[in-house]
Amino acid sequence: MATLRVSSLFASSSSSLHSNPSVFTKYQSSPKWAFSFPVTPLCSKRSKRIVHCIAGDTLGLTRPNESDAPKISIGAKDTAVVQWQGDLLAIGATENDMARDENSKFKNPLLQQLDSELNGLLSAASSEEDFSGKSGQSVNLRFPGGRISLVGLGSSASSPTSYHSLGQAAAAAARSSQARNIAVALASTDGLSAESKINSASAIATGVVLGSFEDNRFRSESKKSTLESLDILGLGTGPEIERKIKYAEHVCAGVILGRELVNAPANIVTPAVLAEEAKKIASTYSDVISVNILDAEQCKELKMGAYLAVAAAATENPPYFIHLCFKTPTKERKTKLALVGKGLTFDSGGYNLKVGAGSRIELMKNDMGGAAAVLGAAKALGEIRPSRVEVHFIVAACENMISAEGMRPGDIVTASNGKTIEVNNTDAEGRLTLADALIYACNQGVEKIIDLATLTGAIMVALGPSVAGAFTPNDGLANEVVAAAEASGEKLWRMPMEESYWESMKSGVADMINLGPGNGGAITGALFLKQFVDEKVQWLHLDVAGPVWSDEKKNATGYGVSTLVEWVLRN
C-alpha cells in the first residue's frame, strides 16, 4: 500500500492503493502518544457475548457470524500536514476556508501551503469538483502517491455534530479506498480555545470509529475494515486530549453495543438474551457493577401487574426484569441516578395488531432501543468509572405478542403502586412496562431518573426521524439533559407537559386508560408515565422513537448512549 507524503505528492511516481395476565388487579399495594481503540462486536468470539453464543434453536436457524474486534490506533499529533505520511488525508474546511484571491488561489494558509506542495493541483481539482465547503459536501481527490479528502463543514464548525460528520466522511473515504492509515485535520483552528480543540479531537475520533463500524454479523459474506490508524493533526497533544479521546473510546464501545442489540432480530435478541448481556456487563466490571435479574414469579411478588400483563402472551420468551447498579467503592457522597429503558424485544401490537405497510412491524425489533442505550451506557460507565454517582440501570424486558394468555383490549391491570389502568389499546404497551420500571426505580431511593423509550409515533410526526422529544416538569433537569445532548452531538428538543391533556386519559372504570383518544399522543404518553414517578424525584422522559433507527442506513444508531453518559458525568 502506498503512503501519502504530502511534501512529495507531485514528484512521486504513481502507485496503486488498496481499493462493517395475568391482570394483577387483585393485588392492591400500598401507595505523540497513541493507543489502541478496540471495538468489540456483540458477536465477537473474543467477547463471548450472549448474542453470539446463544445455544438454543432460533427461528430460521439464524446465528450471527463470528468476527474479530477491529482495532484503530488513534494518536493526536503535532505533525505538520505537509509532512504527514499515510494513505489518506482528510481536511475539514468551512466555506470561509475555501475563499480564494483574485488569482483563484486559496487564502487559507494551510490549504495554500498544501496546494503549493501539489503544484496547484488541489486548487484546480477542488474547483473542478465545485467544492465550496458547504455542509454535507465531500470530494475525494487522488493524486500521485495518495489521496486527499476535502469535507465541507458549512459556514462554521462550532458543534460536535460537524466534527462527527468530518470523522464519518473520513471513515467513508478510507473504506472506499481501503486505506489503512489516515489523518484528519482542520483547515483552520482560528477561534478555537484549547478546550474546544480537545473536544473537537474527541468528536472527530468518535466520527471515525462509529463511521468505520459495520454490523456484518448476519451477512453470508462481508469485507472487514482495513483501517488501522488515525492521526489527528493540529489540535494539540498531551494528557488532556489523551484522556478525552480515551473517553470517546469508551462511549463508542457503548454506542456499538447499543447498535448491535437493536440491529439483531427478535429471533436472536430475546428478553433472556438482554438479561444475559446485563450479566456479562456486571461480570466484566464486577468491582463497580452489580446485577439483579428478576423472573416473572419475582415480579409477581412485587405486584408488577402492568409489566406482566404485557409479557403474558409470550410464553416461549418469558420476561426478565433487569437491574444493574454502578457504584464505586469510594466513601464520598454519591448522587443517586436511574436510567430506565423500554425493553420490548419485539412488539407485534398484541390484539391491536400492527397491520399495513405504515405499521413498520418489521422494524419492531428496535422497540428495545431505550434498553439498548441504557445497557450501552452501563458498559461505557463501567470503563469510565465516575466516583461521585450511583447509577441504577433498569429494563423491564419482554415481548408483546398474541396468544390465549395475552392481554386483551378492555382489560384492567394494576401497577405496583396500586394504580389501575384500563387497557384500551394493547399496542400502547411500552408505557405499561415502564410504569412498573419507574416505580421500581423510585423505590431505589434515586434523586433523578431519565427514561428512554421508543414510545410513540406521534413524536416522529412532531420532530421527524432524527430528533428525540424530552418531557419533564423540572426546568433544571431539562437544562442538564439538553446541555449533555449538545455536548454529545445528539439531537433532542424539549416538549411541553400540557397537564390539561390528562383529562382525556381518565377511564370510566379505572384510574386511567393507557392511550389517549387523538392528537398530542407524545404528550399524553409522557403524562401517563408521570403518574408512576414519586413527586420528590426529578424525572425526564426521552421519546426516542425516531433517532434510534436510520432508514437511510437501514441500521441502528446507538442513540442516547452518549447523552446518558455525559449527563451522568455532569452530576
From Swiss-Prot:
Q: Tell me the NCBIfam families matching this sequence.
A: PRK00913.2-3
> What InterPro entries would the database entry show?
Leucine_aapep/pepB, Macro_dom-like, Peptidase_M17_C, Peptidase_M17_leu_NH2_pept, Peptidase_M17_N
Q: Which GO terms describe its biological process?
A: cellular response to heat; flower development; protein hexamerization; proteolysis; response to abscisic acid; response to bacterium; response to insect; response to jasmonic acid
Against Gene3D superfamilies, the record matches this protein to: Leucine Aminopeptidase, subunit E, domain 1 (3.40.220.10), Zn peptidases (3.40.630.10)
HAMAP family referenced in this protein's UniProt entry, alphabetically = Cytosol_peptidase_M17
- Note on how the cofactor is bound: Binds 2 Mg(2+) ions per subunit.
- What protein name does the entry list? Leucine aminopeptidase A2, chloroplastic
Q: What EC number(s) has UniProt assigned to this enzyme?
A: 3.4.11.1, 3.4.11.5
The entry's keywords: Aminopeptidase, Chaperone, Chloroplast, Hydrolase, Magnesium, Metal-binding, Plastid, Protease, Stress response, Transit peptide
Q: Where is the transit peptide?
A: 1-42
**Domain of life of the native organism:** Eukaryota
Single GO term (MF)? manganese ion binding
Annotated function = Catalyzes the removal of unsubstituted N-terminal amino acids from various peptides. When associated as homohexamer, catalyzes the proteolyzes of Xaa-Leu dipeptides. Possesses leucine aminopeptidase activity against the model substrate leucine-amido methyl coumarin. Presumably involved in the processing and regular turnover of intracellular proteins. Regulates wound signaling and has a role in insect defense. Functions as a molecular chaperone to protect proteins from heat-induced damage.
Q: Which residues form the active site?
A: K354, R431
Q: What family, per the record?
A: Belongs to the peptidase M17 family.
> Which organs or tissues contain this protein?
Expressed during floral development. Expressed in healthy and senescent leaves, cotyledons (emergence from seed coats), pistils, sepals, petals, stamens, and floral buds (at protein level).
Gene name as annotated: LAPA2
Write out the residues that bind Mg(2+) 2. Answer: D347, D427, E429
Origin species: Solanum lycopersicum
- Provide the reaction this enzyme catalyses: Release of an N-terminal amino acid, Xaa-|-Yaa-, in which Xaa is preferably Leu, but may be other amino acids including Pro although not Arg or Lys, and Yaa may be Pro. Amino acid amides and methyl esters are also readily hydrolyzed, but rates on arylamides are exceedingly low; Release of N-terminal proline from a peptide
Q: Does the keyword Phosphoprotein apply?
A: no
Please tell me which top-level EC class this enzyme sits in: hydrolase
Q: Write out the annotated subcellular location.
A: Plastid, Chloroplast
A single Gene Ontology CC annotation of this entry is: chloroplast
Upregulation: Induced by wounding. Accumulates upon infection by the pathogenic bacteria P.syringae pv. tomato. Triggered by insect infestation (e.g. larvae of M.sexta). Activated by the wound signal molecules abscisic acid (ABA) and jasmonic acid (JA).
Binding, Mg(2+) 1: K342, D347, D367, E429
Task: Identify which cofactors the protein needs according to its UniProt entry.
Answer: Mg(2+)
Subunit structure comment from the entry: Homohexamer (dimer of homotrimers).
